[in-house]
A protein has these predicted regions:
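Conserved SAM-binding loop of SAM-dependent methyltransferases across substrates and taxa
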Residues: 58-70
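Class I SAM-dependent methyltransferase Rossmann-like catalytic core
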Residues: 7, 11-46
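Conserved beta-strand signature within the Rossmann-like core of class I S-adenosyl-L-methionine
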Residues: 148-155
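A short SAM/SAH-binding and catalytic strip from SAM-dependent methyltransferases
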Residues: 118-132
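S-adenosyl-L-methionine
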Residues: 85-111
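Conserved SAM/SAH-binding beta-strand->alpha-helix loop
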Residues: 81
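Conserved class I S-adenosyl-L-methionine
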Residues: 48-57
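A short glycine-rich, Lys/Arg-flanked "PGG" loop and its adjoining helix->strand segment in the class I
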Residues: 135-147
Length: 156
């Protein structure tokens, strides 16, 4: 992989956020290009009308997702970290990026109005959550997905 200024900047910001908030940020650096490609392939983007990303961090996977789904498809991201959220809004203007908790996904997706997600990609730090939090988040995800929807989660 060729290191670019953007890659270095993403890695630096990610590591800096981890140092400042290790109980919320679950990785030391952003996902690799290989992981991004595998994640996108797993959700079958050509079939998706609605894609959700939870915990997008610096937006590395977000970029791959947005480049792969149909421009008419709906995309929604939820990021809890205020610095990541602000940077994501600047990097992806006009994209639905909400600041908050994954347990509130339905509030932003509003599946009763705009349909359920065909795919949910999660970069959430599951090992930092209690069992109760994991169950609550997974229940919220399930309630917002199509019955045949695809759920992909990344663990580090």
């Amino acid at each position: 992989m060729v290191r670019t200024e953007q890659n270095w900047e993403n890695s630096f910001h990610f590591f800096w956020r981890f140092i400042h908030n290790p109980l919320k940020i679950g990785a030391l650096r952003p996902s690799s290009a290989q992981l991004c490609r595998a994640t996108v392939k797993a959700i079958e983007p050509e079939k998706c009308r609605c894609v959700v990303e939870l915990g997008p961090g610096t937006g590395v996977i977000t970029q791959y997702l947005l480049n792969s789904i149909d421009p008419q498809s709906r995309f929604l991201a939820v990021e809890i970290d205020p610095v990541f959220h602000e940077n994501l809004q600047k990097r992806f203007p006009g994209t639905a990026i909400h600041r908050g908790d994954a347990e509130d996904l339905g509030k932003w997706l509003q599946p009763q109005k705009s349909g359920l997600a065909d795919a949910v990609v999660s970069g959430l730090p599951w090992t930092l959550f209690t069992e109760s939090q994991c169950r609550s988040i997974l229940a919220e995800i399930a309630s917002c997905m199509q019955p045949d929807g695809i759920f992909v989660t990344l663990c580090y």
